[in-house]
UniProtKB/Swiss-Prot annotation:
The gene is CA6. Zn(2+) binds at H111, H113, H138. Its main location: secreted. It comes from the Eukaryota. It comes from Canis lupus familiaris (Dog). The lineage of its organism: Eukaryota, Metazoa, Chordata, Craniata, Vertebrata. This is Carbonic anhydrase 6. Residues 21-278 form the Alpha-carbonic anhydrase domain.
Length: 320
């Protein structure tokens, strides 16, 4: 088991050797503010994530719904790893996404961004009218015109990411996430991996995947290459408070600390156009609504903290 863990950790050790120190989100010499020092593209003009300001989004009636194939019930084994920055699941090439312009993209992997720190409970990367959601799911694809992800990641039209924002309110358990969340304890430390048996990505997404925002941007982690066609779904994934707490508190980072707030800060739009394939609803970005949402976030944090306390204090029944 130790030999396997060491083998899986070799790419992480290689990254440390190549760049001097591992990049982080908020600590050390290579936190996200200083990424451009060793990854110059991270200081580019077409970076992600961005704030999706609905009153500025341009409706494009020619944009059609995304065509997702192979997302429904995949049989087999799917490696899941703690890479020190997030939880990442490898996906089969039978999963495809076709954009409105006819470009077909092949799924490579999916990963998650979340909050969890006491001062900031929300951890989505994209925001809507300045409002940050609890978490965000990214399904990374590469352009099928290229033979592999390794080739496509260096090409100007190489990548596409399908993103879904996560809400948590008084929802019951989302059973489509039960298998995934139950495996988090198996990858507590960076480099550890486990295997998911069977995966239904379609059910892990919002029920409605027809409406989206789209723009041209970058990867949100180093090397921040500016070759990503982003599709951010309008409708949300719903998780229970307990599921969200487990996502936020189950794995450790490279500093042996609980991995919290693994999201990049909002980047300037720099004149880019954000389009949608639906007519926007009236904006909720007023100052009043902003503070209402902020208060709701704080109340949600306190509620989840109470739920956590209840779980920890739940008596254990010992059988004779």
């Amino acid at each position: 088991m130790r030999a396997l863990a060491l083998l899986l950790a070799l790419p992480l050790l290689g990254a440390r050797a190549q760049h001097g120190s591992l990049w982080t989100y908020s600590e050390g010499a290579l936190d996200q503010v200083h990424w451009p020092r060793e990854y110059p593209t991270c200081g580019g003009t077409r970076q992600s994530p961005i704030d999706l300001q609905r009153r500025k989004v341009q409706y494009n009636p020619s944009l059609k719904a995304l065509k997702l194939t192979g997302y429904r019930i995949q049989v087999g084994e799917f490696p899941m790893i703690n890479n020190g920055h997030t939880v990442q699941i490898s996906l089969p090439p039978t999963m495809r996404m076709m954009a409105s312009d006819g470009t077909e993209y092949i799924a490579q992997q999916m990963h998650f961004h979340w909050g969890g720190a006491s001062s900031e409970i929300s951890g989505s990367e994209h925001t809507i009218d300045g409002i940050r959601f609890v978490a965000e799911i990214h399904i990374v694809h590469y352009n099928s015109k290229y033979k592999s992800y390794d080739i496509a990641q260096h090409e100007p039209d190489g990548l596409a990411v399908l993103a879904a924002l996560v809400k948590v309110e008084d929802y019951g358990e989302n059973t489509y996430y039960s298998n995934f969340i139950s495996h988090l304890n198996n990858i507590r430390y960076p480099g550890q991996s486990t295997v998911l048996s069977g995966l239904d990505i379609e059910d892990m997404l919002p029920e409605n995947t027809h409406h989206y925002y789209t723009y041209r941007g970058s990867l949100t982690t180093p090397p921040c290459t500016e070759n990503v066609h982003w599709f951010v779904l309008v409708h949300h994934v719903r998780l229970s408070s307990i599921q969200t707490w487990k996502l936020e508190n189950s794995i450790l980072d490279h500093q042996n600390k609980t991995l919290h707030s693994d999201y990049r800060r909002i980047q300037p739009l720099n004149g880019r156009v954000v389009e949608s394939n639906f007519v926007n609803l009236p904006s909720q970005g007023s100052e009043f609504q902003f503070y209402v949402n902020k208060l709701n976030n704080k109340l949600e944090y306190l509620r989840r903290l109470l739920e956590k306390t209840k779980v920890e204090k739940k008596p254990h029944i010992h059988q004779a």
